[in-house]
Amino acid sequence: EIYRADVSGVVMGERGAPGELCGGASSASPIGSIEENTVRGIFGTSRTPLGTLPAMPVAAESEIRLGEATILSTVSTGGVRSYDAVITRIARSGDGGKLTLTITDGDLLAVTGGIVQGMSGSPILQNGKIVGAVTHVLVNDPTTGYGISMVTMLEAAS
């Protein structure tokens, strides 16, 4: 089942030791259910609206470019914030689009050291469109991680 959650702290990532977001469920009632957890995404059903952020257009894989990007994540009690990143590699294969990204945002680096466990699913934005989501941190370099394209996730969901 899916529950609303609050972030209560961060264990900062460092070389060889991925950090993590600490927190817990903020309500006793589930807001949805998970039906499938795959390499292409977690799929389920929501019983209530999941947030107040506006819908965004999805970038075609051909629109994803190397260079500046933004991730949206909640790493403190302040709620969702945008953080600067750079897409450094795009691998298109039969498995779909896979992205490599590096966090460049000073605020995020100061709090988390980069990408930490618990940030999976954080949207990756570029040129006003959602291009994908964070999936993994590179353990030997927490400033760097991987993502999956939104098109790949949507294809898997259909």
What are these regions, as identified by a protein language model?
Residues 1-158:
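C-terminal recognition in membrane/secretory proteostasis and scaffolding
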